Amino acid sequence: MKLSLVPIFALLSTAFALPVENAERDVPIEERAAAPTVTIASPAATIIGGAGATVETFAGVPFAKPPVGALRLKPPQPITSALGTIKATAQAASCPQFFFSTTINDAIPTSALGLLLNTPVFQQVLNAGEDCLYLNIQRPVGTTASSKLPVLFWIFGGGFELGGTAMYDGSSWVAESIAEGKPIIFVQVAYRVGGFGFLPGAEILADGSANLGLLDQRLGLQWVADNIAAFGGDPSKVTIWGESAGAISVFDQMALYGGDNTYKGKSLFRGAIMNSGSIVPADPVDCPKGQIIYDNVVASAGCSAAANTLTCLRGVPYSTLLNATNSVPGLLSYSSIALSYLPRPDGTALTKSPDLLLASGNWAKVPFIIGDQEDEGTIFALFQSNISTTAQLTTYFSDFFFHNAPTSVLTGLLNTYPNDLISGSPFRTLLLNNWYPQFKRLAAILGDLTFTLTRRVFLKTALKVAPTVPSWSYLSSYDYGTPVLGTFHGSDILQVFNGIKPNYAASASKAYYLSFVNTLDPNNGTSSAYANWPQYSNGAQLLNLYASFGGFISDNFRSTSYDYIVANLPSFYI
């Protein structure tokens, strides 16, 4: 079977190929009332936004110099000159995206296709370019500089390859915060992804230009610290929140510079929320796999013979570099979440692998919420339909994921996951949903290693290192019964962030999160319609959300696999 996604993505490659100078910002935001205006000092600017019925939006506010020309593949630079008047009523361009094939062989069952096409990772990106470092700010109508509202700072996901602020609208969160009497300001940050933001290699390391996407996020937080008070926000009450790569980024922000999250002597954030992501054990920027990625990009860009290959990459046309960075294996492919681009230790900003920083206590110890979807791995196991035996599964992990892991360790890991039709993900579905012979088994392993059991490692390690830091955890099951996918990775964006179904899961999540943003406790001021959510330290209980109800379960499932992962964690670096 060959499923063509050409009708869905027909415009995608065109958008990706747009040169920077043609990237347009022509998506107007409806202005129903007098335009709200804010004056900031750092950098000096007057910012004019758009007003809706209950929410004011300032879209496309620059927080860094455009990373173009000599600043391409360089750390972000703060804006130092006055900007005059900015009409912030149109979305800025998304950062360059990692495109993928429009035809997927035997990949997506038709029963799952419709749901997947609604998730942000499958959305069309019609406006992308290198000049992309902008913020979106949304606040309640009538907010003034004296309001001092708490701030929810959103970091989008997309496997460090895809995504942008235009895919997410925080107005429903602001509106709900008003309705609940817990008003907030919602801020989104853009950051460079793919090879533009996370190019590895020894040359990148020597140049001091690793993990640019994380540095973009950090500069965005610093901009908020300098300027959010003018919008009516309280810079001392910032909560950072992300999903998937955004959630991984949240912990990376907690761990950057050895856990120093201060700026001008004050903390950049006081709380954290991680939806589907935490620590990703990773080899250094100049590891062998990273160097292969860099060398392949250099070769694809025609820079192999250059005296300085990085200088060459900075000078090639935008479309040449875009195609070169996208010539390596991508997220939505056979290699799945064996990512080409991701945060890697650089010895300066991300000083060590995140798991080591966590265990050594080198992270900002702020209260946090962290959780997962029940079937995190199903979406990433759709592309390997040729795998039908345990031996092939072992080879797959050895070839694509864990190059330094002994075969015996990989075999031992697989042995903790039954090789039958009943077990595996989507979980609790008996004989159903085995898309190919090893699908449910592979989906379970991918989901556990990257998200679910790694979350448990994160929580238990954090409790050991910092037992007084409050934490809460959840497991979402609201899409139980969805064919093939179950409650899949990214489904919380549809259910919780966008609220496409106004059900218990959506309303409970918003109530808990808004209470946390306001008070650092998801139970403080939350309606009695929702149960008291115990801290993880109180018996390792997970809030378990279904579409129409919620409950609690113990975080002890798949304990044999968990124990094995903990005992062999050094073998599972990517």
UniProtKB/Swiss-Prot annotation:
List where this protein forms a coiled coil.
none
Q: Recorded E.C. number(s)?
A: 3.1.1.1
Q: How does activity depend on temperature?
A: Optimum temperature is 38 degrees Celsius.
Q: What class of enzyme is it?
A: hydrolase
* pH sensitivity of activity: Optimum pH is 6.
Gene Ontology CC: one annotated term: extracellular region
Q: Main localisation, per the record?
A: secreted
**Glycosylation: residue positions:** N323, N386, N524
Q: What happens when the gene is disrupted?
A: Impairs all extracellular esterase activity. Does not affect host cuticle penetration.
Q: Where is the active site?
A: S244 (acyl-ester intermediate), E376 (charge relay system), H489 (charge relay system)
Q: Where in the cell is it found?
A: Secreted
Give start-end of the signal peptide. 1-17
A GO molecular function term, named singly, is: carboxylesterase activity
The cysteines covalently paired via disulfide bonds are C95-C132, C303-C312
Q: What's its catalytic activity? A: a carboxylic ester + H2O = an alcohol + a carboxylate + H(+)
The record's induction entry says: Expression is repressed by glucose or other simple sugars such as sucrose, fructose, galactose and mannose.
Q: Which UniProt keywords apply?
A: Disulfide bond, Glycoprotein, Hydrolase, Lipid degradation, Lipid metabolism, Secreted, Signal
Q: Which family does it belong to?
A: Belongs to the type-B carboxylesterase/lipase family.
Physiological role: Secreted lipase that allows the use of hydrolyzed lipids as carbon sources. Has highest activity with methyl umbelliferyl oleate (C18:1), whereas much lower activities are obtained with the respective esters of palmitate (C16:0) and stearate (C18:0) (24% and 12% of the activity obtained with umbelliferyl oleate, respectively). Hydrolyzes 1- and 3-positioned ester bonds in preference to 2-positioned ester bonds. The production rate of monoglycerides is lower than that of diacylglycerides. Seems not required for the penetration of intact host tissue.
This one is known as Secreted lipase 1
Q: Which organism is it from?
A: Botryotinia fuckeliana (strain B05.10)
Q: Which gene encodes it?
A: lip1
